Amino acid sequence: MMANHLVKPDSRNCKRARELEPQVSDSPQVSSLGKSESSLSEASGLFYKEEALEKDLSDMSKEINLMLSTYAKILSERAAVDASYIDEIDGLFKEANIIENFLVQKREFLKQRFTVITNTLHK
């Protein structure tokens, strides 16, 4: 009783129409003409499924390539921004070095000046 009951796969997540699934014949015996028509029908169904699969794969490939190129563009833009930040920081370091050197020279000048003033006051 259970052997005659066929369980059909869950087709809720299937994108294809149910008619693409091979149908089980209820008749116990099929003529040779019926068998050749059936195998021709199955072959054309397989060809259709193969074409549909190739189209789906092609579409997915295009979509993946689009996402990868978008990702590469974003990375390129971020790299350009990072490079501009590095250039700006380099400029700030150079400016800080110039100011530091100026302040060191100024301190030495003031030190010499105070030495002269101190020597003058001691005389």
UniProtKB/Swiss-Prot annotation:
It comes from the Eukaryota. Keywords: Chromosome, Meiosis. Residues 1-41 are annotated as: Disordered. Testis (at protein level). Detected in ovary. Expressed in both male and female germ cells. Pfam families: TEX12 (PF15219). The keyword Cell wall biogenesis/degradation does not apply. Residues 31-41 have a biased composition (Low complexity). InterPro entries: TEX12 (IPR029193). It is found in: Chromosome. Coiled coil: none annotated. One of its GO terms (cellular component) is central element. GO terms for biological process: meiotic DNA repair synthesis; synaptonemal complex assembly. Interacts with SYCE2. Component of the transverse central element of synaptonemal complexes (SCS), formed between homologous chromosomes during meiotic prophase. Requires SYCP1 in order to be incorporated into the central element. This is Testis-expressed protein 12. It comes from Mus musculus.
